[in-house]
Regions:
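Acidic (Asp/Glu-rich) sequence patches and key acidic residues
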Residues: 1-119, 123-136
C-alpha cells in the first residue's frame, strides 16, 4: 500500500464502519453475498468505512470510504504488496489528497486521483464478491 500513514489520538478518530465478508464457493455463498449487501447499505453517506471482501482468504479486495469517495486495493495472495485504484477520469488538482481511516484508527492519506466516486467503488466490490475478479 502506498500512502502516508499516521496514528491519530483516540479522541480524534471518527466513527468508522468495519465490514469483513468472506465469500465461500459452497452453499453459504448466497448468504455471504446478502450479508455484504446489508453491510454496504449500513455505511453512512458522509462517513468512513473499511470494507474487506475475500474468497477464502485470497484474493481479497479492500475498499476505504470517505464520504462520496472510495479507494480500492486488491491483494492476490499472502504477502502480496497488492495494487490500488487509479482514476483516469480525475481532472482536479494533482496534489489534492483524501484521508481515510482504518477500523483500528490508523489514518491513511492518498491522492484524490486514486479515488473513485463511492457508488462506482462499491459496485467494484459487488463485482469482485460475485466473480472473484477486479473489474476493469
Amino acid at each position: 500500500m502506498s500512502g502516508r500513514r499516521s496514528k491519530e489520538s483516540e479522541d480524534q478518530v471518527p466513527d468508522i464502519v468495519e465490514v469483513n465478508v468472506t465469500v465461500p464457493d459452497g452453499d453459504e455463498r448466497q448468504a455471504a453475498l446478502a450479508e455484504l449487501e446489508d453491510a454496504l447499505a449500513s455505511v453512512p453517506a458522509a462517513g468512513y468505512a473499511e470494507v474487506w471482501v475475500d474468497h477464502d482468504s485470497f484474493p481479497a479486495l479492500c475498499l476505504l470510504v470517505n464520504g462520496e469517495h472510495g479507494w480500492l486495493m486488491c491483494l492476490r495472495y499472502s504477502g502480496d504488496a497488492g495494487f490500488s485504484s487509479r482514476n483516469p477520469a480525475y481532472v482536479g488538482d494533482p496534489d489534492a489528497t483524501l484521508e481515510y481511516y482504518l477500523s483500528n484508527g490508523q489514518r491513511d492519506v492518498y491522492p484524490v486521483a486514486w479515488a473513485y466516486p463511492r457508488e462506482r467503488a462499491v459496485e467494484a466490490v459487488r463485482i469482485f464478491a460475485q466473480s472473484r475478479r477486479v473489474p476493469d
